[in-house]
UniProtKB/Swiss-Prot annotation:
Protein name, UniProt field: ATP synthase gamma chain
Record GO terms (molecular function): ATP binding; proton-transporting ATP synthase activity, rotational mechanism
Localization annotation: Cell membrane
Domain of life (superkingdom): Bacteria
Subunit structure: F-type ATPases have 2 components, CF(1) - the catalytic core - and CF(0) - the membrane proton channel. CF(1) has five subunits: alpha(3), beta(3), gamma(1), delta(1), epsilon(1). CF(0) has three main subunits: a, b and c.
Listed GO CC annotations: plasma membrane; proton-transporting ATP synthase complex
Xref: InterPro entries: ATP_synth_F1_ATPase_gsu (IPR035968), ATP_synth_F1_gsu (IPR000131), ATP_synth_F1_gsu_CS (IPR023632)
Gene name, Swiss-Prot/TrEMBL: atpG
Membrane topology according to the record: Peripheral membrane protein
Family recorded in the similarity comment: Belongs to the ATPase gamma chain family.
Native organism: Mycolicibacterium vanbaalenii (strain DSM 7251 / JCM 13017 / BCRC 16820 / KCTC 9966 / NRRL B-24157 / PYR-1) (Mycobacterium vanbaalenii)
Length: 309
């Protein structure tokens, strides 16, 4: 009985220690959400505007540029999977990895071989454990990404994308680099504090997108004068466009990670509270039973002495 009481008290102490950790993680995540959400809201207009601008320029120039025109018989598609560096964030990583696997299946059905790039240690660990080749990975900034991080990733993706234009069959082209024909990104889209969902987006060749439910107005289209020529302009805008889209995705993923971690840690803290209450009640009952038994033994001993006299 004493051993059982000692075990219950040990479990109460363990649950209390875990509760302190989860509560601290919850508070840290809560403090980061507001800043992350503000960065998402600040980046969205620029990302939407550069996409809209390139779409309008494309319709005005009729330029046959790799950013705008899908290649014939695409063979490979780069997929950037954005995960977290740390755990304790509920189903955040599981959802984005499931979305990535669904995209891989879709690409293979279309005859395209996925070429894998990852952000975050969790995605790298997942694919490495399954012996899936990861061309390049980045880690250490999933919660606080910067534009420099996005630009580094974008430079790698753009190089692979532009190199894919001259590839022949399954072999590298004249530049000696085995490129890709499409660029995709899988990340967690931040909708609100309580709602985040995994999403897959194709960023090159461009897909015409309209913000919200807005549709292009009917009537005369805007005329553009290009200086320098359209091809030079698009060559300069391609890395910036990809970097902007990657940066927006990284910010959304960071905000979603903090929101998921806060929700998971709050649930863990509440569960620890419930467990401590249940264990405390069990310990009190055990202690009460122990005291009752001791009293019974004392009374029994006293009665035995009285009978002996």
């Amino acid at each position: 009985m004493a051993a059982t009481l000692r075990e219950l008290r040990g479990r109460i102490r363990s649950a209390g220690s875990i509760k302190k950790i989860t509560k601290a993680q919850e508070l840290i995540a809560t403090s980061r959400i507001a800043k992350a959400q503000a960065r998402v809201e600040a980046a969205r207009p620029y990302s939407a505007e550069i996409t809209s601008m390139l779409t309008e320029l494309a319709s005005a120039s009729a330029l046959d540029h790799p950013l705008l025109v899908a290649r014939e018989n695409p063979r490979r598609a780069a997929v950037l999977v954005v995960s977290s560096d740390r755990g304790l964030c509920g189903a955040y990583n599981a959802n984005v990895l499931r979305q990535a696997e669904e995209l891989f299946s879709l690409l293979r059905e279309e005859g395209k071989e996925p070429v894998l790039y990852t952000v975050g240690r969790k995605a790298l660990g997942y694919f490495s454990f399954r012996q899936r080749e990861v061309v390049e990975s980045w880690a250490g900034f999933s919660e606080r990404p910067t534009y420099e991080n996005a630009r580094e990733i974008a430079d790698t993706l753009v190089t692979a994308f532009m190199s894919g234009a001259d590839d022949e069959g399954d072999d590298a082209g004249a530049d000696g680099i085995l490129g890709v024909d499409e660029l995709h990104i899988v990340f967690t889209e931040f909708k609100s504090m309580l709602s985040q969902s995994a999403a897959a987006r194709r960023i090159a060749p461009m897909v015409v997108e309209y913000v919200g439910d807005e549709q292009p107005e009917e009537g005369p289209q805007t005329l553009f004068s290009f200086e320098p020529d359209p091809e030079t302009l698009f060559d300069a805008l391609l890395p910036r466009y990809v970097a902007t889209r990657v940066y927006a995705a990284l910010l959304e993923a960071a905000a979603s990670e903090s929101a998921s971690r806060r929700r998971a840690m709050k649930s863990a803290t509440d569960n620890a509270d419930d467990l401590i209450k249940a264990l405390t009640l069990a310990a009190n009952r055990e202690r009460q039973a122990q005291i009752t038994q001791e009293i019974s033994e004392i009374v029994g001993g006293a009665n035995a002495l009285a009978d002996a006299k």
